[in-house]
């Protein structure tokens, strides 16, 4: 460590010895000085250690049951899909750790198992992927397949998906290479028919072809500023071998393909589609051949070996979603009003009415918040300005839009409806 001052009284950095004139700023402590350059260096060292810790965290991958337990706290229903995802994610990161610690060339190389989620809008596909990434503390990015086009056409390149993941990892490449990418609306890039078309399909089969390499694992050149607008920028190299890709889509109409296939195979045994277990969704019987008939190319399907079907949420499921998860919507709005010292209660019939509205609008769980916002708008406007409001009760009539919430006052001996 350098002396703080010399014979001329010049202040020096205690770490690098530079004078006040040689640096931008020197910060004084009890008998110690440090310059801005040494502060920056210390920050870099600390950041690197934190990044190393974040990368090392994955060596202790939660078991499938532990992953399922976390999913159960946040996601209602979809039991089969949650179990499938728990096993697939555990196996993926076990494979990542094995590839890093493989000692000899005789070790069996484990192939990557990307995941395809099939289910209607609002059934929880995106939320499941987000919860998995949060549970594992890995970078997470969402992309929309409908915005992607082949290189050379107007639209987003597939490399832009990796840019979003890199940004989520604060541009730490090593962390990004162990992240999760969720590609939504994957069914929208299906071929229009099984037959190969001679016309160019720049947002369909062409995008599937463009995605093949990064799904399988390749070293991709990612433009840090977004590609086409900055053609002369330096590229960042990202290896996608250990990136877990989860794709999702509603696949409207695929149930007809499944029914036709099951019907053809059961006729010889005197069974019909109605002989299937009524409690089981037809979607649970999807196989890769059905995706092929829907319009995904064989090479693309081959890179999505794990398939999980999500059922359409029922009225009871939506009521549970409103109240049971850790961050349930009802709990969120109760918390909001509690900040204004006001209690909030939803009558059971009101919850059923809210769920019925979501089903009527065909929005699933995704539409629940907007419905509650409509119901709560006047309440959330009035409560902050009226300290006499003690409690708000959301009734069935209020939920249906035929009445107003019940207001209970603490100072005025009355009840307004």
From Swiss-Prot:
Superkingdom as given in the UniProt entry: Bacteria
Quaternary assembly: Component of the ClpX-ClpP complex. Forms a hexameric ring that, in the presence of ATP, binds to fourteen ClpP subunits assembled into a disk-like structure with a central cavity, resembling the structure of eukaryotic proteasomes.
GO molecular function terms attached to this record: ATP binding; ATP hydrolysis activity; ATP-dependent protein folding chaperone; protein dimerization activity; unfolded protein binding; zinc ion binding
Family of this protein: Belongs to the ClpX chaperone family.
Span of domain ClpX-type ZB: 1-54
One GO term describing the cellular component: HslUV protease complex
Residues engaged in binding Zn(2+): 13, 16, 35, 38
PANTHER family: ATP-DEPENDENT CLP PROTEASE ATP-BINDING SUBUNIT CLPX-LIKE, MITOCHONDRIAL (PTHR48102:SF7), ATP-DEPENDENT CLP PROTEASE ATP-BINDING SUBUNIT CLPX-LIKE, MITOCHONDRIAL-RELATED (PTHR48102)
Protein purpose: ATP-dependent specificity component of the Clp protease. It directs the protease to specific substrates. Can perform chaperone functions in the absence of ClpP.
Single GO BP term: cell division
Protein name, as recorded: ATP-dependent Clp protease ATP-binding subunit ClpX
Residues the record lists as binding ATP: 120-127
N-terminal signal peptide: none
Keyword Chaperone: yes
Keywords recorded for this protein, A-Z: ATP-binding, Chaperone, Metal-binding, Nucleotide-binding, Zinc
InterPro entries to which the protein is assigned, alphabetical: AAA+_ATPase, ATP-dep_Clp_protease_ClpX, ATPase_AAA_core, Clp_ATPase_C, Clp_protease_ATP-bd_su_ClpX, ClpX_bact, P-loop_NTPase, Znf_CppX_C4
